[in-house]
From Swiss-Prot:
It holds the Pfam family Trp_syntA. GO terms for cellular component: cytosol. This is Tryptophan synthase alpha chain. The gene is trpA. One of its GO terms (molecular function) is tryptophan synthase activity. Keywords: Amino-acid biosynthesis, Aromatic amino acid biosynthesis, Lyase, Tryptophan biosynthesis. Its EC number is 4.2.1.20. HAMAP family: Trp_synth_alpha.
Amino acid sequence: MNNRYYQLNKNLIPYKLGCYIPFVVLGDPSIEISLEIIYSLIKNGADGLELGIPFSDPLADGPIIQQANLRAFSANITLTKCFEMLFKIRTHNPKIPIGILIYANLIFKLGIQKFYSICSKIDIDSVLIADVPIEESFEFEQHSIKNNIDSIFVCPPDASKNFLKKLSKHSTGYIYLLSRSGVTGIDMKITPPLKNFVKELKKLTSIPIIQGFGISNENQIKNIILSGVSGVICGSVIIQIIANNLNNKKIMLKKIKKLSNRFKKATII
């Protein structure tokens, strides 16, 4: 629906590049440093952004991202402040695709119509609602269509053919392919390259397939891109750098810059 993801994929394919999309939680460890981190990621290889809206009970996330949510709340983050940050990020870079990951309660509390209207005004590209399955997504989808915002749904690596058909019908922007079942994190093994699975999924959809969950090194990224997906989403490994360097912003930003450049280079096939 929103053409930034389509344009990104179209621009990268001729050069045999996959896209690299980092994930961080807005407001972690503070609003000011969070913005510095995001601007650094944009400058150092990020093709798109996936940004988490802090939530008190993030069921889809492992301990690393849960702690990031807690740090953001300690910095007094609110949904309103998240929108203000997103506006600054969009103003900073009008071209980069920006997706947000959010939990349904936050949308209900604000109001579905108002939420999507604000996202549209900020020029957000996509919304992934972590705890709303396709079967319960109708009302959200209607508002996303009305506001020209892509609906992102996750695809487990063991999904049935019936689910893949449903997924291809409802997904816009891209399909978020999970490396494995469970929660986010960097300590657990990811599923081996899903080449045959990706091949079957591509028969049903032409939108980009982007893989995330547990991706923490260049070899994983290279193998994932070679399996036929369009790109990777990497979060926990970046957020761990934030957690390990809370008392030294300079080192934190230096390590994130280095990692981001390495990960982008790994998408070259």
